Amino acid sequence: MSIFLLLTALSLVKSPHLLQQGTPIAAIINSPVSGNQPPNAQSLLEKGLTLYQQEQYSPALQIFQQAYAAFQAQGEKLNQALVLNYLSLTYQQLGQLTDAEKFSTESLQLLQNKSDSQDYLSILAQALNTQGQLQLAKGETEKALSNWQAATATYNKIGDEPGKIGSKINQAQALQTLGLYRRATTTLEEIKLSLDQQPDSLLKVTGLLSLGNTLRVVGDVTQSRQILAQSCEMQAKRSHSENLCNPQTTALVQPTPEQEKLAEILLSLGNTAQAQQNTQEAIEFYQRAASLSQQQTTQLQAQLNQLNLLTQSSATPEIPQQILALVNTLPAKLETLPPSRSSVFARINFAQTLLKLAKSGLLAKSDITSQDNCTAAASLCTAAKIVATGYQQAQNLADVRSQSYALGTLGSLYEHTQQWNQAQTLTQQALKLALGIRARDIAYRWQWQLGRILSATGNPQNNELGAIAAYDQAVKNLKSIRRDLVSVNRDAQFSFRDEVEPVYREYVSLLLPKTGEPSADNLDKARKVIESLQLAELDNFFRQACLDSKPVQIDDIDQQRQTAVIYPVILSDRIATIVSLPNQQKDKSLKLHTVVIPKNTFETTVKELYKKIFAVSAHEFIRTSQQVYDWLIRPIETDLQNSGVKNLVFVLDGTLQSIPISALYDRQKKQYLIQKQYNIAITPGLELLPPQPLAKKQLQALVGGLSEARDEFPALPGVKYELEQIKTIFSTSGNFLDQNFTPQTIEQEIKSFPGGILHLATHGKFSSKVEDTFILTWNTRLNVRDFSSVLKSHENSNQGVIDLLILSACETAAGDNRAALGIAGIAVQSGARSTLATLWSVNDEATAALMIQFYKEIAQNHKKAEALRNAQLYLLSGELNPRFKHPYFWAPFVLVGNWQ
């Protein structure tokens, strides 16, 4: 037996909301080493292992301690080290990381006397794996990677191929956490190659399953689907089952013991299909998994996932029959589960789904105090009763983490029915438990919930102050667990949009009153919270907390103090715009302007604005554009004029990221914003902004692109002319076009590039999903992560910085309201000081004309934002072509990052 045969679930500190980023595959639960150990010690250890696998961690802990004492009395140091390792794993499950670290260290200390025996090396590899798991939990990723590399070498030494594969999967997750995507990808490819070389077997099926799940966790859902499908087909063949792995085909499901593994794979396929937003396929996989499995936990997990997905996708005024059928049958099934952490969380999961139905108006509000009178399954009364039983089970298991979740979930049910006293008491009890075990991933939820309750329970000032304090602590905890939040466990009911983003927005809403003036301190706090939300969005986009942020003042970036930073925030009932102005006293540098408008109305108008940019007549666009101008710019006009600023830097929120701010229209002056005196740039936040301006030196450009049609994308005949003209303005250190425009060539050219401007004229797609954000090369779609890795080769070559990255023919994904997040993603991951990109694909001739004019402006030492503005005004003038006056031609170009 080895690490690999114990699936990831056994290593998870399970929660109904979060899968910790980089959660490694656990050290395997092995039997004691051979020798003359006393039967009592061996039986104790086996009993402890059984309890551990049943998720009864506190009883397992007691038995492991007895087993350790028995082995210690016999002087069995190797078995002592083994049991210490299990104690560490058990303490990790209980969330007691200090004790877990203590026993892990003691286990390794007992293994200091080196040996070449198989037993010694096997236990050493397990101990190294456990130590790496702890180090990752503490954020010591490089140390974790080192230990997993040592574990891999140890498994290799004893010829344990499954163990080697498991520890290499852990390495890949650590590399991903460190942002070393190419190395992570290479490692995962090595794992796949190693598995492919093995004969078909249960071991290979399990290996592919684990690899597929890992790929989903790190965000490669396409590859995850392929690997899981391979695992499924192999196991279907082994168990003589046909058509079960294809959701498009009809399958006859007849459960047999041999098909249990197949059910497990189908469950994972459902999770990956859900991550791909293939709702119907995910439901089909979940249904097959539930029908095929004879294990209660697998059946329930599949049905709960199916119910949650159906609830999310339901838009009917009444509960659909498919949902109602599950809601009516699941409570009885929950009652049959033996007490364990999984059964507690299954109860919580079900209750949270009922709460979602209630919040969407599909369940009537009811008094949930008298739980003995519950009759209907689809009621909050039933939900409360089920969770209360779960809490009792968690108490009996001495599982503090589960107790906290159960109490907090009960609090959320009482919150919904506005039974405020009970809601507050339960939430505070849940928070106390979470803080007691330093479980910040749970604590932030109850701090947020407490903030909502205090905010809703009347007007007393002490409640408002208490709500602000609760939200403040919730945001601080969110920032401290960034790495844990970015990998979503699709087995659980967790969503960034539902359970992270609202914390920031509600906190901003509380800090910025609808009427009256906020204090200077609250205004500054709100600005910082907005910056934190931008960072959290990018973390969620990359599924990695790999971005470094540093507090920065605008005057540190713009020494001439000619820049205003504008933060429009979309709140539920208003647009709050914070403006940071230069040349002001410290307590007066921030100003707030509020426009009362429902969120839905505002966002509908913004989406309409984007659609009208493609209308033949500019007048249709202008009618909507001037409305958005009145909401965003009109209220701050006087402040901008009085401060004498020349640069406007926008930190855009939500749907605003997809529209061209420069094309907002002033109906009074009858001019676009860009026609005023302002240079315009956008940034995902000052804290992510490299402050250095464009280097004052002889500029060089590295240019490349595609002019021919490739991969269903049309030809770009204007690219050749565009690149040729750039050469007449700049010294170019390289030029790669069409067949030469490959990732390998780009990387090779970049390594010797002395720095300056990197100009890539090619198709590309920006999306709110990292896997769908790419630029097109001759032979592949270069994903944003791989593109980042290619650009990192320039940083590693000790050449000058890339001052400006230009992507002149890209576009945002149609129908994706947050697609512009992909632009910000490329901008911050590229390492370039600034990025010039397009919101939509533009006419070839117009693009070439604007880019050539932009380079002419840069050559005259104009700042980047100023150069872009002048180039856009050149097209807008109609001098080259009257058609180009339409904002469709000049407005999509946006400068992200440093504007100087």
Feature map (PLM): residue ranges:
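Inter-helical turn/loop elements of alpha-helical hairpins
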Residues: E55-S58, Y91-K102, G139, G179
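N-terminal leader/linker segments that initiate helical-solenoid repeat arrays
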Residues: I3-L82, Y86
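Catalytic cores of enzymes
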Residues: E284, L334, P551-N600, T605-Y610, ...
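Non-membrane alpha-helical segments in proteins
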Residues: Q42-Q53, L78-Q93, Q126-Q133, A137, ...
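Alpha-helical solenoid repeat scaffolds used for protein-protein interaction
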Residues: L5, S11, Y181-R183, E189, ...
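Mid-chain, structured segments of secreted extracytoplasmic proteins
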Residues: Q72-Q109
